[in-house]
Amino acid sequence: MKTFVAKPETVKRDWYVVDAEGKTLGRLATEIASRLRGKHKAEFTPHVDTGDYIVVINAEKITVTGNKAAAKTYYSYSGFPGGLKSITFDKLIVRKPEMILEIAVKGMLPKGPLGRAMLRKLKVYAGTEHNHAAQQPQVLDI
């Protein structure tokens, strides 16, 4: 019996919507990353994008434990001398709440073209409204 290898053109991708209200950042991000990779499917193949589309709503209401809200710092570097910028979790969740979950999930996906393709299937929205109703996403309880 031969090992099954999924083909990119035959992979069936479903759409799911996840409500992030009151959820812990890391626990939610690990489950989303696993679903984006397709590890929950029987036909998972490491070098093929077999994951589903995930729409996350209420990203502004995501939580972290302990004092991480004040202590967790996100860095960005422009490439120029003195171009290192930092922002704490508290300030970033007010300014760009979608970015927090995207950064967390991005670190859990493979690095390279396949990981970037998986990350494109993640849609994060700060509020309850999203514009993917035409895809009829199923509610995913995490």
UniProtKB/Swiss-Prot annotation:
Gene3D superfamilies: Ribosomal protein L13. It comes from the Bacteria. The keyword Ribosomal protein applies. One of its GO terms (biological process) is translation. GO terms for cellular component: cytosolic large ribosomal subunit. Disulfide bonds: none annotated. One of its GO terms (molecular function) is structural constituent of ribosome. Pfam families: Ribosomal_L13. Keywords: Ribonucleoprotein, Ribosomal protein. Part of the 50S ribosomal subunit. This protein is one of the early assembly proteins of the 50S ribosomal subunit, although it is not seen to bind rRNA by itself. It is important during the early stages of 50S assembly. Belongs to the universal ribosomal protein uL13 family. NCBIfam families: rplM_bact. This is Large ribosomal subunit protein uL13.
